[in-house]
Amino acid sequence: MTILIKNNNLQQLLSSWIKLSYSYTISGIQSDSRLVKPGYLFCVLKKKNINETNKHMIHAIKNGAKIILYDTKQKFKNGTLKKIINHVPIIYFFKLSKNLPQILKKYYHFENNFTLIGITGTNGKSTTTHIVSQWANLLNVKIGIMGTLGHGINNNLKKTDNTTESSANIHQFLYHMLKQNIKTFAIEISSHGIVQHRIEQLPFKIAILTNITPEHLDYHRTMDNYINAKKAFFFKYNINTLIINADDLIAKTWIKKLNHKNVITITTKDQNFNSISPKKWIHANKIIQKQNCTNIHFNSSWGHGILNSTLIGHFNVINILLALATLLELNYPITDLVKVCKYIKTISGRMEHIHIVNKPKVIIDYAHNTNGLKNLLSTLKEIFNKKKIWCIFGCGGDRDKTKRPYMGSIAEKMSDQVILTNDNPRNEHPLKIIKNILSGCKFKNKIRIIPNREHAIKFAVNNADKEDIIVVAGKGHEKYQIINNKYYHFSDHKIIKKLLNKKNYDFN
């Protein structure tokens, strides 16, 4: 077992920023009040709502926080006492959000003897992360993963709140995994995580880019801001090995500007491969897609081979090639990787098939943005080209509203039947969201509105022919529905299995 020693002396830990008169030994650091334990340093990263901030402080104190650092933008307050609650001092800390990663780095002081992989992009982060993990596991190597589907090893994952967790949670995860002698980690990197400093001070060895298309414009405001957030991970972080999908138009423009780094490109297009001329590369020169598998013929700077995979869709070809490049760069033998590729399983809620004899095939997918839905439906039209496609989807409330009409347009053009339903409406009225989606649709005769998601799925299952394809998009692996900001248990997977197994299904 790896021996790790934390820097628990608080005065010493914070000496670069503030001088404390409090001589404390801490047992941990957290920015989430729910995860605070006795003896912890709690870091209050200020929220817009001051009542929420105070509520988190009280919660942290009840959980045993020993001392609290309180974020401030006023430099003159740095290191001064804000107040004391129940014998717990609350100290102002200038730009705590920005400095917290550095404090955590000093607290854990990891030796640089492990491999940390960061995977970013609009779509495909979870799938690529899990392919890397599964593939390595098939060759008897365990990889710690952290992202949308959870954190841990292989199928033994614990729930995460965000695609990219807080800086405190990431460091804590690495610490516990290193104690178990895990030496390689793959972490999903969101644009929010980059902008909010959550991944700063982490010793990334490899950065992977899946693709860049419009997303999170409610947060970033413009596409340029979103692109620049992703770009920062490759240009501003000290990461030497960069693995890039050269089929992506935006990513392709970055490659020559990064020629001072160890850039590895993957591509499925001959013209892209010929125009880039990279030092390290993988080029899929022939792709055969079937209804239940994909064959990928590839050449590379490591050698050539044929990958057989049960994952379908061109976007999954990209994800597989990115994972392949990662493992080849980490010196996994190409022959072994080719041999075991066929055993990689479908990732939960990502192009996941549920099929029972004499019933329509149902596909669950997390596609929740314009490009994701387009790729999903175009793949199904190509592979199941003579079958009728039903598309059930909605758009999240209190999120990017600009994508709604585009998603409506894509669904009606690429599906035979469309059912608009709820997908985490949050604080928005469900019918208002559906109206926004409908504004992009021209042929409303093929569209049905059933806000209750369970009812929508039931309607499709009961009315689709056994040869039809039903696509349930947007929620994927999620096991909840958010309505009026309350979480209700809901699983597409569970509902579909129940419906397909029962002829006469009654709603609860």
Curated annotation (Swiss-Prot):
Q: At which residues is N6-carboxylysine found?
A: K230
> What GO biological process, any one, is recorded here?
peptidoglycan biosynthetic process
PTM comment: the record says: Carboxylation is probably crucial for Mg(2+) binding and, consequently, for the gamma-phosphate positioning of ATP.
Which compartments is it annotated to reside in?
Cytoplasm
User: Record-annotated residues binding UDP-N-acetyl-alpha-D-muramoyl-L-alanyl-D-glutamate?
Assistant: S33, N162, T163, T164, S190, Q196, R198
Sum up the protein's function in the record's words.
Answer: Catalyzes the addition of meso-diaminopimelic acid to the nucleotide precursor UDP-N-acetylmuramoyl-L-alanyl-D-glutamate (UMAG) in the biosynthesis of bacterial cell-wall peptidoglycan.
The protein depicted here goes by the name UDP-N-acetylmuramoyl-L-alanyl-D-glutamate--2,6-diaminopimelate ligase
Originating organism = Buchnera aphidicola subsp. Baizongia pistaciae (strain Bp)
Q: Which gene encodes it?
A: murE
